[in-house]
Curated annotation (Swiss-Prot):
Family under the similarity heading: Belongs to the EF-Ts family.
Region (Involved in Mg(2+) ion dislocation from EF-Tu): 84-87
Main localisation: cytoplasm
Keywords, in A-Z order: Cytoplasm, Elongation factor, Protein biosynthesis
Keyword Protein biosynthesis part of the UniProt annotation: yes
Subcellular location: Cytoplasm
Official protein name in the record: Elongation factor Ts
Length: 283
């Protein structure tokens, strides 16, 4: 049996992220065999991960990447959640999030479910995440996933502070001409949280719900019935300006809309996505 030295304990702790007592127990059980000790830690951790699954995991970070394709570019964004920001900002957690993003790109995944089934070395992303939960001692899960494609894809990653990893990632796909204002549009998406690109993209049931609310509100305010339809249309237009990207006032110059930015350069936006840590379950 190999001597269980402080150096050995340090090595296993650095490689696994497990606590000192857990490492000592694993090394003792493995009779000083480092590889076997790591296996023990992983096995025990995966079993414990099931107990953590019921716990809230709404902290975390987002990794993003743009890759070239035959038709232009594709952007990917993957949110990885933890229970605390203490874990989320550790270099190992950020590094693991980047690894998961890499698996998404390699598999050309189209959803979080596809990503979980993708290969991660000699295992799957789902199992790799369960192992990570064991190492970090918290419930860890893949959260939101976004993928968009276009002639050009711009990505902006927003951090709350310099020492924290990204908490918001905004991506926008444009044609070649639109690339000139894509960065400004990505900043807008991050700051203002548009939900749809054009008003035609807003689901009919959402529009009808807003129309009913606006009608009931106008009548409750005692507005003359004959002018209610005009008031309702005005309120619907205000709603569209809030939730439709191309109709939002541009944050740097509210005298124009985001759509105006693209008109000025003769370009078009074709798709966008916004991922914010902890917002997936709320929405």
């Amino acid at each position: 049996m190999a001597a269980i030295t402080a150096a050995l304990i340090k090595q296993v702790r650095e490689d696994t992220g497990a606590g000192m007592l857990d490492v000592k127990k694993a090394l003792t059980e493995a009779e000083g065999d480092v590889a076997r000790a790591k296996e023990i830690i992983r096995a025990k951790g995966i079993a414990a991960a099931g107990k953590r699954e019921g716990r809230k995991a709404q902290e975390g970070t987002i990794a993003s990447k743009v890759v070239e394709t035959a038709n232009g570019e594709t952007g990917y964004a993957v949110e990885l959640n933890s229970e605390t920001d203490f874990v989320a900002k550790t270099p190992k957690f950020v590094e693991f999030t980047e690894e998961v993003l890499g698996y998404a790109v390699d598999a050309d995944a189209n959803s979080a479910d596809e990503l979980l089934e993708a290969k991660a070395g000699d295992t799957t992303v789902k199992l790799a995440v369960e192992e990570a939960a064991a190492l970090f001692g918290e419930h860890v899960k893949v959260g939101q996933f976004a993928k968009i494609s276009g002639e050009h894809v711009e990505v902006y990653a927003h951090k709350k502070s310099a020492e924290m990893p990204p908490s918001i990632v905004a991506m926008i796909a444009t044609d070649k001409a639109g690339a000139a204002v894509a960065h400004e549009a990505a900043l807008q998406i991050s700051a203002m949280g548009a939900k749809w690109l054009t008003r035609e993209d807003v689901p009919a049931d959402v529009v009808e719900s807003e129309r009913r609310v606006a009608t009931e509100k106008s009548l409750a305010e005692g507005k003359p019935e004959k002018i209610v339809p005009k008031i309702v249309e005005g309120r619907l237009n205000a709603f569209f300006k809030e939730v439709v990207l191309l109709e939002q006032p541009f944050v740097k110059d509210p005298s124009k809309t985001v759509g105006d930015l693209f008109k000025e350069v003769g370009g078009n936006a074709t798709a966008f996505a916004r991922v914010e840590v902890g917002k997936g379950e709320e929405e």
